[in-house]
Curated annotation (Swiss-Prot):
InterPro entries: Asn/Gln-tRNA_amidoTrfase_suB/E, Asn/Gln-tRNA_Trfase_suB/E_cat, Asn/Gln_amidotransferase, Asn/Gln_tRNA_amidoTrase-B-like, GatB, GatB_C_1, GatB_Yqey_C_2, Gln-tRNA_amidoTrfase_suB_CS. One of its GO terms (biological process) is translation. It is an enzyme of class 6 (ligase). SUPFAM superfamilies: GatB/YqeY motif, Glutamine synthetase/guanido kinase. It catalyses: L-glutamyl-tRNA(Gln) + L-glutamine + ATP + H2O = L-glutaminyl-tRNA(Gln) + L-glutamate + ADP + phosphate + H(+); L-aspartyl-tRNA(Asn) + L-glutamine + ATP + H2O = L-asparaginyl-tRNA(Asn) + L-glutamate + ADP + phosphate + 2 H(+). This is Aspartyl/glutamyl-tRNA(Asn/Gln) amidotransferase subunit B.
Length: 474
């Protein structure tokens, strides 16, 4: 029997505010344990939370970027559960009146656009961190109270690849709008996967399993692939899927049982009496909408329409904010040939950076270097082949292409008279080949071009060489 996976993601995004969600403690990754805490985030009796306005602004910004409807009224609620790293005995979250609902993200899976609907986006505070060492457990409350957005998708994803693409697109949007660095390694973006299987063609959902706290895009894909295989194996044998929470073991590539899945009523949600309902005016929402930068999809569309890039090239460039910024800086230096600039970035620079493990923001090849290189080729000062040599040298030394061309004497010979003399000399030295060419062996054109290039150490302008050869071999 063929099964179809039904996947929804719950993504927690840590907002890049300077201070926590309900107090003035600073947010500092890697600080000494329990140094950025106060009576509010420690849950001391009598301490009162106050909402961070910047966190609210960032959450509204994210909601609008994800095409959500932002509600003029939302309410903070207490989510009650007991954990050593939850000092108040409850988490401030939102329940039946979230900040925003009904959004979507479009992703491209196998060249087909799929719309993944977003059920809701709500604000909440993070818990602290429990570190287990031997027979001891240590609690660090520096993270407690950090502002989070929980972004819950509808179960519209149908493959492990689709889930990964959705997550990557979500991270990209968060970075573009500047509300989060969304670095999974630092825990700034955390993902829980809800997955069930159903027979293909059926509408009814199967029993849902949740996989908690997966901390990389690759592991999200691997965890889903394994879970699809595990559930399909059970169903084919006539077994039943248990509704539960599982964890993913990165070493074995398998999921394992964590606990039985809670229902919402287990958390006994109720409105937080210490926080007044959040009322947002339409004017404030519009003000934030106007402050949104150009988003990845809009940018890609502009690259295709205005700069005449292919859809593929545009998507590769906008898939990373720093990459798009690099491209735009290069085009601002030399705007005559954006297609060639895109080609050099995608086909040469990205591969080299990946090889060396360098981020594009730290690239030794700067945007102005790529612009200058393309300009040198367009003007006929160097050939594309020499351009690759120059690029390698720029990457090694950080020198400008012009400097390298001058230092190494790589400037292309574009003097027609000079090239004509060399072509005539080559033809005079190979009379037999000339006769064969004139008798119909057109393949010898490559031989003549090669001889001219050899004589000029690859510096002759290939277009001129071809033009003069065709004239003289008529």
């Amino acid at each position: 029997m063929e099964f179809e996976p039904v996947i929804g993601l719950e993504v927690h995004v840590q907002m890049s505010t300077n201070t926590k969600c309900f107090c003035s403690c600073k947010i500092e990754f890697g600080a000494e344990p329990n140094t950025n805490v106060c009576p509010v985030c420690l849950g001391m009796p009598g301490s009162l939370p106050v909402l961070n306005k910047k966190a609210l602004e960032y959450a509204i910004k994210a909601s609008l970027a994800l095409n959500c409807e932002v509600h003029e009224l939302s309410v903070f609620a207490r989510k009650n559960y007991f954990y050593p790293d939850l000092p108040k005995g409850y988490q401030i979250s939102q329940y039946d009146k979230p900040l925003a609902t009904n959004g979507y993200i479009d992703i491209k899976v196998n060249d087909k656009t799929e719309r993944i609907r977003i059920h809701r986006l709500h604000m909440e505070e993070d818990a602290g961190k429990t570190i287990h060492k031997g027979s001891y457990s240590y609690v660090d409350l520096n993270r407690a109270g950090t502002p989070l957005m929980e972004i819950v998708s509808e179960p519209d994803i149908r493959s492990a690849v689709g889930a990964r693409l959705y997550l990557e697109k979500l991270r990209n949007i968060m970075r573009y709008i500047g509300v989060s660095d969304a670095d999974m390694e630092k825990g700034q973006l955390r993902c829980d996967v809800n997955i069930s299987l159903r027979p293909k063609g059926e509408e009814k959902f199967g029993t849902k399993v949740e996989i908690k706290n997966i901390n990389s895009f690759r592991f999200v894909q691997k965890a889903i692939e394994y879970e699809i295989e595990r559930q399909a194996r059970i169903l084919r044998k006539g077994g039943e899927i248990v509704q539960e929470t599982r964890l993913f073991d990165e070493k074995t590539g398998k999921t394992f049982t964590m606990r039985t899945k809670e229902e919402a009523h287990d958390y006994r949600y109720f409105p937080d009496p210490d926080l007044i309902p959040v009322r947002i005016t339409k004017e404030y929402i519009e003000e934030i909408r106007k402050s949104l930068p150009e988003l990845p999809d809009q940018k890609a569309e502009r690259y295709v329409k205005e700069l005449k890039l292919t859809e593929y090239d545009a998507e590769v460039l906008v898939a990373d904010k720093d990459r798009a910024l690099f491209f735009e800086k290069a085009v601002s230096v030399y705007s005559e040939n954006p297609k060639s600039i895109a080609n050099w970035i995608i086909n040469e620079l990205l591969g080299k950076l990946n090889e060396e493990g360098i981020e594009i923001s730290n690239s030794p090849v700067r945007p102005e270097h790529i612009a200058e290189l393309v300009q040198l080729i367009d003007k006929g000062d160097i050939s594309s082949k020499i351009g690759k040599e120059v690029f390698e040298e720029v990457f090694k030394t950080g020198k400008s292409p012009k400097t390298i061309v001058e230092e190494k004497g790589l400037k292309q010979v574009s003097d027609e008279g000079e090239i004509r003399k060399i072509v005539e000399e080559v033809l005079n030295n190979h009379p037999a080949e000339v006769e064969k060419y004139k008798a119909g062996n057109q393949k010898l054109m490559g031989f003549f071009v090669g001889q001219v290039m050899k004589a000029t150490r690859g510096k002759a302008n290939p277009k001129l060489v071809n033009k003069i050869l065709q004239e003289l071999l008529k």
